[in-house]
UniProtKB/Swiss-Prot annotation:
Disulfide bonds: none annotated. It is found in: Cellular thylakoid membrane. Contains one covalently linked phycocyanobilin chromophore. Transmembrane segments: none annotated. One of its GO terms (biological process) is photosynthesis. GO terms for cellular component: phycobilisome; plasma membrane-derived thylakoid membrane. The keyword Phosphoprotein does not apply. Belongs to the phycobiliprotein family. It is a peripheral membrane protein. The gene is apcB. Keywords: Antenna complex, Bile pigment, Chromophore, Electron transport, Membrane, Methylation, Photosynthesis, Phycobilisome, Thylakoid, Transport. This is Allophycocyanin beta chain. It comes from Anabaena sp. (strain L31).
């Protein structure tokens, strides 16, 4: 997805 934020830290 283009609107994908980094949710994996």
């Amino acid at each position: 997805m283009a609107q994908d934020a980094i949710t994996a830290v």
